[in-house]
Structure formats: structure tokens, C-alpha cells
Amino acid sequence: KTYMLPGDERIVAGNAEEFVHELRVGSWMDSDCTDEQYMHNFAERYVVQAGVRIATDTPEKFLSDLIRTGYAKEI
């Protein structure tokens, strides 16, 4: 699956775990932490920037919330 992110960035991932990993690897902020730490860090920044809380307990819920809030769109 291919996901469109803000700034016309695209992530190709076969599942939610791969999506989180690719999002982290492409991050200029948190590329050196674990995928789990990245989800938590991203969620903290997102609530400040967008005022929306996203789940971080599983990659599936994290991705689902990013799609629900409009940050990511499956294309």
C-alpha cells in the first residue's frame, strides 16, 4: 500500500509496522530511536501541533488514527 503524507511525501508499506518503521527512518527528528519510541514522540508532537490525540499502543491503531485525522491517506 502507498500512503500520502503532508508535503507530498509517500510511504510504501505492506503493514502498519512497516509504515511506522518507514516513517521513523525518514524522520529528521527521531530516526535514531525505536519504532515504539517514535510513535510516542510523534503523538506528543501531533497533539501540540494539531490538537488531536492518536493511539500509540499498536502500530495498527497508530496508522488508523493518522488516517482518521487526515495526516495519512491511502492512495
Language-model features: locations:
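N-terminal acidic leader/helix
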Residues: 1-29
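Acidic, aromatic-enriched beta-alpha/helix-loop junctions
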Residues: 20-57
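Short, compact, well-ordered microdomains
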Residues: 51-75
